[in-house]
Amino acid sequence: MPAPKSLFQQQDAAPALSRDDAKKLTDRILSFAKADETRVNVNSGTAGNTRFAGGQVTTSGNVSDTTVTVVSTIGRKRASATTNVLDDDSLRRTVDLAERLARLSPDDPELMPELGPQQYLTIQNRFASTAGLTAEQRVAAANAVIA
C-alpha cells in the first residue's frame, strides 16, 4: 500500500488561463453559437488553502479551475449554461444547452441588448509573493494568527 501524500508536499495546480488563451477559448465558443446574441464569461483562477482544526493542519492544497458561462439570446428570450469541461464537444453541448433553454424561456419584456465586444484594462491581479507561498509558509502564517 502506498504511503499517504504529505500535507506539506507542494502539488502544482494548473495555471489560470492567460488573456490570450481566454480570448482563443471565447472565439472557439462563439464559433459554435447560432443564437441572435451570445455572451461568453470566462472565469479562471488558482487558489491555495490550508485548513486547521484542533490546532493542527487538516488539509492543505492548491485548486485550479476554469469555468465558462454561455448566455444565449434568441429573440426576446435569454438563458445560460455553465461548464468547466473545455474540450470542443463539451463546449458545443454547453452552447447548445444555452440555446435550447433560451428557446424554452418566456419572452422578457425588459430584455436589453448585449453590450458587444468590450475593451478591458490590464490589471495586476496576481502577486508572485502570495501565489508562490508554499504549504509550510501558509501554515506558519496561520499559526501566527491562531497563536
Where are these regions (language model features)?
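Active-site bordering "gate/hinge" segments
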Residues: 1-147
